[in-house]
Curated annotation (Swiss-Prot):
One of its GO terms (molecular function) is deacetylase activity. Keywords: Carbohydrate metabolism, Hydrolase, Magnesium, Metal-binding. Gene3D superfamilies: Glycoside hydrolase/deacetylase (3.20.20.370). The gene is celC. Mg(2+) binds at residues 61, 122. This is Carbohydrate deacetylase. Belongs to the YdjC deacetylase family.
């Protein structure tokens, strides 16, 4: 039986360096999909790249722990009007603020002339018990698949069979990537999360995960990787194709 894999690059829109790294991993590597941070400074730049490359599947990367909100959501921000990076505001956040902000991010995504292929989130905040009900409602309204949820209550939203968040950190290699691919069972669809990028000033000043992104990019664009996946009978797809399986 065929096996399918979506290789999704998170943080599209974080900075131009991130955007160009993701594009490189798509054009010359195994990345098939990306998720866009609608509240970040390079979101519009990412959207232009996406429209220029329609084969790249682009979903929405909901953000509640990075940058500034698009809506007036006082229970979600700190004294500087920014989302706290560790997500501590989510515990006491008002449901209405979460709804307003996620709707605002989705509306901005649509304003770019794009339709999201799926939903995931920065730092996996869609798994938070105060956030998931809102995400579930939006996913049902727009009929969008979501990245698998490991901690929220059971749901009926479409999602892949296997999610690999562990192509992340120091010392990543092609063998590490292949070891994940080898865990996809017959007839299953998997998603591998990744964060390729080129380092630029916004990334270096805003993220502690920088050099590792360049290392990820090198692995994801290894010229032998596509062939090795094909030899294993793994087909690269996006969430668009997944929804039709």
């Amino acid at each position: 039986m065929p096996r399918y894999c979506i290789v999704n690059a998170d943080d599209f829109g974080y900075s131009k360096g991130v955007n160009y790294g993701i594009l490189e991993a798509f054009q010359n590597g195994v990345v098939t999909s990306a998720t866009l941070m609608a509240n970040m400074p390079a979101a519009e730049h990412a959207a232009r790249l996406a429209k220029d490359h329609p084969e790249l599947g682009v979903g929405i990367h909901f953000v509640l722990t990075c940058g500034r909100p698009l809506a007036d959501v006082p229970s979600l921000v700190n004294e500087n009007g920014e989302f706290p990076r560790r997500g501590e505001a989510l515990v006491g956040a008002r449901r209405g603020d979460i709804e307003r902000e996620l709707c605002a991010q989705l509306e901005r995504f649509f304003s770019f002339g794009l339709t999201p292929t799926h939903i995931d989130s920065h730092h996996h905040v869609h798994e938070h018990p105060n956030v998931f009900p809102v995400v579930e409602q939006l996913a049902e309204r727009y009929r969008l698949p979501i990245r698998p949820v490991r901690t929220a209550r059971p749901h009926r939203l479409p999602t892949v069979d296997v999610f690999f968040p562990d192509f992340y950190g120091d010392g990543l290699t092609k063998d590490r990537f292949i070891s994940l691919i080898d865990r996809i069972g017959d007839g299953q669809t998997a998603e591998v999360m990744c964060h390729p990028a080129y380092i630029d000033v916004p990334l270096a000043s805003g993220s502690s995960y920088c050099q590792q992104r360049v290392e990820e990019l090198a692995v994801l664009t290894d010229p032998t990787l596509v062939a090795e996946m094909a030899e294993r009978g793994v087909q690269l797809i996006t969430y668009r194709e997944f929804y039709k399986l």
